[in-house]
């Protein structure tokens, strides 16, 4: 029978493997080819990766706004209000959650994590809103 420690260790290993699957995450969130190419060309250079993430965040934010407007155009007044409330709450959560990742004591890696969190959350929400228009 495994001890709590062994189970915890196994959980950490599985979690670590899940974190190291950016191509799957990128495909799931519908990242652009420009982003994937940019990240590949960055060769792990933090400044270049930051530029790639910033550019893709702008593209994903535009996609999110487009999907939000499209969904709003299909909703009744009551449902529009519900979506506005939900979207405002989501923005607050995303900002607070991703700010937590940007630990000022964590160096450039933590800042990159915070920016990537923001990008992933925005892309996921854009996809979610797109799926709701169907």
Give the location of each predicted region.
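N-terminal secretory signal peptides that target proteins for export/translocation
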Residues: 1-4
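Bacterial N-terminal signal peptides
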Residues: 9-21
């Amino acid at each position: 029978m495994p001890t709590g420690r062994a189970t915890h260790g196994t959980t950490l290993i599985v979690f670590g493997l899940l974190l190291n699957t950016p191509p799957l995450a990128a495909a799931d969130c519908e990242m652009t080819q420009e982003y994937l190419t940019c990240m590949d060309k960055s060769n792990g250079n933090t400044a270049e990766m930051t530029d790639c993430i910033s550019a893709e965040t702008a593209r994903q934010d535009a996609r999110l706004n487009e999907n939000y407007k499209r969904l709003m155009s299909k909703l009744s007044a009551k449902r529009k209000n519900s979506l506005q409330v939900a979207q405002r709450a989501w923005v607050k959560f995303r900002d607070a959650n991703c700010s937590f990742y940007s630990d000022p004591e964590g160096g450039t890696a933590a800042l990159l994590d915070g920016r990537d969190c923001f990008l992933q959350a925005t892309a996921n929400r854009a996809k979610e809103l797109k799926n709701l228009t169907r």
